[in-house]
């Protein structure tokens, strides 16, 4: 099967096979000329048909079996609750990890209330893995639990005990991941992260599958910051190798994964056709041709079957924004950016007359596209479009601000750069887009997001700083405004590596602010913002890999992940 897929795939750009130095050099050269790598995929997904062996059995039979298994898993929640809170915590962790938690929202909420309440049962537990899993699942669902639960694993000096922990890779990995639910000023978890990381790095060469793969992934991107969809893809292949795994839960996870992937492939075909028509219509050859990567990104944020509308709105909004961003960054003059922005602020079709001629089709298609999004909404949801338009207009204003800086060759202060660039990252704009598309948010939630709360701004910081770290490593477009590293270096006389370390630390702090906000938020609003902020921020980690790559600009960096997610059989 893998050989058949490989034969069908478009050839990999040779740059993706080069060593790191060559990749960086090619990236810098391409960026300096505004000459982006062509699409890795072309029209592959427009004509792609799943081979019969990938479909396995008729979809109707798969759904019938999945529905039966859901009933069986609900019984397991009841049985776990009757046994102990520890059993409930382990079951929740498995279901979440395998990506089927959306099937059991009520059961998980009930289980977590018990897990949160039964502190005594966990207080007497001396298994690091169990204690860490409880800490992780509670904090991920907005329930506060003190880091004091790890005190029992410290020695008389207050340090984590090497004798207790260093021969326990599973416990160390769970501690490492759980500790990344840290909030600002929780210094007690900093040493847990450092301790676990150093010992995991030391022992990784001795670990066996699947532990070695799990440790490797988490050392790159900790589990609470990793894409839920990608993690479930990996864990489905690994869970069956774990002692005590549940065969019915694993079967359900495989069925759900394949059913959802079938929908994703249909959506991907549709959006690739939409994009090809749009790209050919607007005639902006300097812009990145990245619709497959955009849709992959959308699935990393919202993969659930019932979220098809949200995925398509997100992906199409992203596509319009990418065309505009590339226009402002690599092609348009300042006057052209000003005219385009002026028209967008009016949001009127007849304002197209003031737009530069070569951008008029882009302007008209963007206005028409957002009207189509509004037409997809229910009557009681249409108010949400006003929040989306407001955020989009703000984004365009900040694009203009950056274009002005670039035109004047102005290097802003680091603080000023951050204030502008977290908005121009596009993430704060995508928050109301996701709230609108998912239908999970109330008017109060839109109002809160519109007030620019720390949680939303922190998401923008994650996206901007990861992007800027990648730009520092790979090179940036010659027309781009100075990035965060350059602003910091100029203002503080720092070296590039010092600036990189400082900005990496700011990215870490942004994640901590997001964690804190999740635990302070009104529980009724949390589900909407876990998607619109947490999962959106997670997707940035995948694209930029901690600032080590820019897999959107250089789509060949994502080819293996796209292939695994959409084309390879579920293990």
UniProtKB/Swiss-Prot annotation:
Induction: Accumulates strongly following fungal elicitation (e.g. Fusarium spp., C.heterostrophus, F.verticillioides, R.microsporus and A.parasiticus). The keyword Coiled coil does not apply. Its cofactor is Mg(2+); Mn(2+). Its main location: cytoplasm. GO terms for biological process: defense response to fungus; diterpenoid biosynthetic process; response to herbivore; terpenoid biosynthetic process. Binds 3 Mg(2+) or Mn(2+) ions per subunit. It is found in: Cytoplasm. Substrate binds at residues 325, 329, 464, 467. GO terms for molecular function: magnesium ion binding; terpene synthase activity. Pathway: Secondary metabolite biosynthesis; terpenoid biosynthesis. Its EC number is 4.2.3.66. Mg(2+) 2 binds at residues 325, 329. A motif (DDXXD motif) lies at residues 325-329. Pfam families: Terpene_synth, Terpene_synth_C. The Asp-Asp-Xaa-Xaa-Asp/Glu (DDXXD/E) motif is important for the catalytic activity, presumably through binding to Mg(2+). Monomer. Sesquiterpene cyclase that converts farnesyl diphosphate to the volatile beta-selinene and the corresponding nonvolatile antibiotic derivative beta-costic acid, especially in roots upon infection by rootworm larvae (D.balteata) and fungal pathogens (e.g. Fusarium spp.). Belongs to the terpene synthase family. This is Beta-selinene synthase.
């Amino acid at each position: 099967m893998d050989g058949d897929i490989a034969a069908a795939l478009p050839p990999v750009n040779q740059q993706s096979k080069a060593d790191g130095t060559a990749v960086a050099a090619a990236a810098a050269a391409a960026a300096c000329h505004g000459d982006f790598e062509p699409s890795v995929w072309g029209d592959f997904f427009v004509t792609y048909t799943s081979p019969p062996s990938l479909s396995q059995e008729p979809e109707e039979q798969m759904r019938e079996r999945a529905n039966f298994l859901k009933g069986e898993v609900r019984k397991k929640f009841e049985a776990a609750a009757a046994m102990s809170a520890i059993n409930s915590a382990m079951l929740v962790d498995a279901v979440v990890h395998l990506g089927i938690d959306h099937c059991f929202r009520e059961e998980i909420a009930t289980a977590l209330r018990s897990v949160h309440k039964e502190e005594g049962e966990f207080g007497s537990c001396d298994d690091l893995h169990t204690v860490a899993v409880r800490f992780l699942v509670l904090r991920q669902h907005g329930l506060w639990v003190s880091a004091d639960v790890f005190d029992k694993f410290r020695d008389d000096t207050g340090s984590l005990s090497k004798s207790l922990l260093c021969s326990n890779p599973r416990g160390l990995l769970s501690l490492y991941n759980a500790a990344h639910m840290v909030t600002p000023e929780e210094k007690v978890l900093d040493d847990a992260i450092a301790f676990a990381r150093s010992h995991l790095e030391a022992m990784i060469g001795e670990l066996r599958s699947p532990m070695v793969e799990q440790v490797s992934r988490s050392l790159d991107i900790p589990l609470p910051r990793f894409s839920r969809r990608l993690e479930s893809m990996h864990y489905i292949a690994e869970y069956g190798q774990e002692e005590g795994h549940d065969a019915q839960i694993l079967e359900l996870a495989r069925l759900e994964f394949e059913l959802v992937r079938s929908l994703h492939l249909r959506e991907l075909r549709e959006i690739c056709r939409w994009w090809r028509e749009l790209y050919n219509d607007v005639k902006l050859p300097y812009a990145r041709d990245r619709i497959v990567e955009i849709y992959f990104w959308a699935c990393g944020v919202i993969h659930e079957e019932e979220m098809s509308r949200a995925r398509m709105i997100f992906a199409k909004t992203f596509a319009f924004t990418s065309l505009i961003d590339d226009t402002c960054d690599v092609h348009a003059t300042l006057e052209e950016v000003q005219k385009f922005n002026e028209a967008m602020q009016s949001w009127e079709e007849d304002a197209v007359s003031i737009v530069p001629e070569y951008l008029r089709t882009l302007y008209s298609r963007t206005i028409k596209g957002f009207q189509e999004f509004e037409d997809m909404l229910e009557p009681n949801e249409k108010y949400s479009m006003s929040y989306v338009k407001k955020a989009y207009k703000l984004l365009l204003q900040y694009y203009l601000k950056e274009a002005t800086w670039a035109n004047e060759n102005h290097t802003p202060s680091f603080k000023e750069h951050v204030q502008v660039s977290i908005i121009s990252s596009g993430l704060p704009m995508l928050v109301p887009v996701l709230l609108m598309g998912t239908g999970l948010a109330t008017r109060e939630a839109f109002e809160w997001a519109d007030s620019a709360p720390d949680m939303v701004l922190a998401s923008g910081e994650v996206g901007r700083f990861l992007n800027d770290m990648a730009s520092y490593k790979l090179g940036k477009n010659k027309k781009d405004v100075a990035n965060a590293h350059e602003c910091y270096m100029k203002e503080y006389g720092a070296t590039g590596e010092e600036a990189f370390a400082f900005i990496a630390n700011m990215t870490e702090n942004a994640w901590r602010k997001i964690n804190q906000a999740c635990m302070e938020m009104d529980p009724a609003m949390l589900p909407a913002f876990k998607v619109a902020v947490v999962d959106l921020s997670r997707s940035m980690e995948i694209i930029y890999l901690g600032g080590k790559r820019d897999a959107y600009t250089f789509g060949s960096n994502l080819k293996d992940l796209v292939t695994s997610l959409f084309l390879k059989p579920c293990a």
